[in-house]
């Protein structure tokens, strides 16, 4: 089917335009119509993306469904997917209908709320399918705007502060990437991402001030420029401080999208740009990345143990889990990269579900303070069961997708650096500590607080939202080859080219 990627990318945008231009009036009927238009658009987008998945050839590691048209000023509108990017497209289209359904109770500026999420979906998909530097940057940066509005308009009491902190961190982190893109165009004469993957950027060591030499030279500088953007987006320690504030102030649906998809743009960027385009720079900075990741895993896990706000605890948990992802990516072997991608997919399901779990009781009690709860199992048995399932999955219980991602990632890291891997393994114990501590305080114990004695269990709508997330977490936990077979050839191609480039450069250096 021609133009399938364009259809998937811009279908939510078309629905947003319909809501903005056609939808008139206000009141309950207009709000209900806006919700149904948004839900229908996201469901249709997911169904169309299934056609993409059905027609995808996993054995082909190259780009598929490529669309390439001349655009402006010599630039090209070019889209395509490989085994890595198609997974993130599917994650996005799978989660968005659930996100819209979780926002069914919203009553303030409903039409605008739905438009913001539809625009955000289109921009997120665009990031994963763009094959032109400028197009990628436009999608990558434009995605800040709807998320900024979602936090700033529909967020909590400190929403303005959190929205601006989110915007400034992520925007300023991308400034260096823009400068690097201009430099890449001047050196390579193209903005085509596939072409740039095979371009040999200068890598000779650069002397500074006569006493210090930058290994990898220009490649390392380009790597660091992209690293600044992707590290903030993931986020990595110590540029993670915007995330807890953003999660705490964002509405539930905003937290789901932020944790499940937006953070993955950083990991995707490392896979699409950092490793294939700047192998010498990546190799030079690998130890640095390992150290930051290991510190993130342990430090943010310890910080999570001290939290009294449920959303903030889960936010710090996300930073710790992304530490495993960056370790796996920069291990640069099949198991490590497979595990990192699997971990990102799994984290999308599990973290999204955990934020939904917080949203369920927040809608009833209007507080996220852990101390305000206790004994919920006595009034909300279905909620207690679902919350326990995703708590165990977040810890990495065998049989869930959380276990597979962590196991593969650690397996890959052990092959590269045993000490770092052992240090990172301690994070598994810490994650069990904070996750079970949260669950015990919220769900177990006596139901002594009067305000909780009339709380109702989950509705049918809420259970229906969780059902697909439970199914995917279990399915990928017992049958992980559904993912590894899809991404395997593309990951193998990435890893082989990375090491081949390093080997070729090493031989050239030795010859000189």
UniProtKB/Swiss-Prot annotation:
Its EC number is 7.1.1.-. Keywords: Cell membrane, Membrane, NAD, Quinone, Translocase, Transmembrane, Transmembrane helix, Ubiquinone. Disulfide bonds: none annotated. GO terms for biological process: ATP synthesis coupled electron transport; electron transport coupled proton transport. It is a multi-pass membrane protein. InterPro entries: NADH_Q_OxRdtase_chainM/4, NADH_UbQ_OxRdtase, ND/Mrp_TM. GO terms for cellular component: plasma membrane. It catalyses: a quinone + NADH + 5 H(+)(in) = a quinol + NAD(+) + 4 H(+)(out). One of its GO terms (molecular function) is NADH dehydrogenase (ubiquinone) activity. Its main location: membrane. It comes from the Bacteria. Belongs to the complex I subunit 4 family. NDH-1 shuttles electrons from NADH, via FMN and iron-sulfur (Fe-S) centers, to quinones in the respiratory chain. The immediate electron acceptor for the enzyme in this species is believed to be ubiquinone. Couples the redox reaction to proton translocation (for every two electrons transferred, four hydrogen ions are translocated across the cytoplasmic membrane), and thus conserves the redox energy in a proton gradient. This is NADH-quinone oxidoreductase subunit M. The gene is nuoM.
